[in-house]
Amino acid sequence: KICQDVKQSLAPCLPYVTGRAPKPA
């Protein structure tokens, strides 16, 4: 959805999807 960079790195995207991080680097 919002984090479509999962192709590059899913790790930094996980916390964003869970709602822990305001925005992935």
From Swiss-Prot:
User: Which organs or tissues contain this protein?
Assistant: Seeds (at protein level).
| The keyword tRNA-binding is annotated on this UniProt entry | no
The disulfide bonds in this chain are none
Keyword Transport listed? The answer is yes
GO MF, any single term: lipid binding
Lineage, top-rank taxon, reads Eukaryota
BP term (GO), one: defense response to fungus
This protein's UniProt keywords? Antibiotic, Antimicrobial, Fungicide, Lipid-binding, Plant defense, Transport
The entry sums up its family as follows: Belongs to the plant LTP family.
Described purpose of this protein according to its UniProt entry: Plant non-specific lipid-transfer proteins transfer phospholipids as well as galactolipids across membranes. May play a role in wax or cutin deposition in the cell walls of expanding epidermal cells and certain secretory tissues. Has antibacterial and antifungal activity. Displays antibacterial activity towards both Gram-negative bacteria, P.carotovorum (IC(50)=11.5 uM) and P.syringae (IC(50)=12.0 uM), and Gram-positive bacterium C.michiganensis subsp michiganense (IC(50)=11.2 uM).
Protein's recorded name: Non-specific lipid-transfer protein 3
